[in-house]
A protein has these predicted regions:
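Generic N-terminal targeting/processing segments that precede catalytic cores or assembly contacts
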Residues: 1-126, 130-217
Length: 217
């Protein structure tokens, strides 16, 4: 069984991930993982944190000469923003934000300072999940299994994949889009919805679609 564990706080020194259960002998490269991290950072509507971080993975165990050893794989991603927070004396955070883990987390862990919850439930944690997912994606390519995810809806705009492009061409279009939607026209309209919502200080709902090719029936 393959398992993974992540640790680290949003404004701590680093994020850490451990993966166990992967077999030995599979090609896994830092460059492939970093390409996923770079795609994660490019989307329109991302917060100011993306201007501070320049994510690159550090592989400290489980991969030697770009091959998995069969032992646990340990990954690290540095938080550049840590230096801006490490010496600050910060007052407790006591007002929960709607739609976040703040309220549930404080109830579960009996926390008096919401910062103890938000540091772990921050979207920053998904950087490590992205790196771990990249390893899985690269290993699956050995079996001619390819995966592509794209944004299929933002606000009132929706895109439905017709299946006319190969999955690699689809991924190229997704990568070129500022909103990760493979249709140029709909991408522009999604961009406009995001900009309008920002101006109104509002939020938008959205949806994603994931496609896999080569999966055995």
């Amino acid at each position: 069984m393959i398992r993974f564990l992540t640790s680290g706080e949003s404004h701590g020194p680093e994020l850490t991930g451990i993966i166990e259960g992967l077999p030995s002998g599979f090609l896994v490269t830092k460059e492939y993982i970093d390409s996923f991290l770079q795609r994660r950072q490019k989307s329109l509507g991302s917060g100011g944190r993306m201007n501070i971080e320049s994510d690159q993975v550090e592989i400290s165990s489980g991969i030697i000469n770009n091959l998995t050893t069969g032992g646990p794989i340990t990954l690290k991603i540095k938080n550049n923003d840590w230096k801006n927070w490490k010496d600050k004396d910060i007052d407790p955070y006591v007002v929960p934000r709607p739609g976040h883990a703040h309220l549930v987390g404080t109830a579960k862990y009996d926390a008096k300072d919401i910062r103890l919850i938000l540091e772990r439930s921050s979207a920053r944690e998904t950087a490590m999940r992205c790196a771990i997912g990249a390893i899985a994606a690269q290993i699956l390519e050995n079996f001619d299994i390819h995966i592509c995810g794209y944004v299929s809806g933002i606000g009132s705009m929706e895109y439905l994949y017709k299946g006319t492009d190969g999955i690699k061409n689809l991924q190229n279009k997704v990568t070129e889009s500022s909103v990760s939607c493979p249709d140029d026209k709909i991408s522009k309209e999604m961009e406009n919805e995001i900009k309008l919502a920002r101006k109104k200080k509002d939020t938008l709902g959205g949806s994603i679609t994931t496609i896999a090719s080569g999966v055995p029936a």
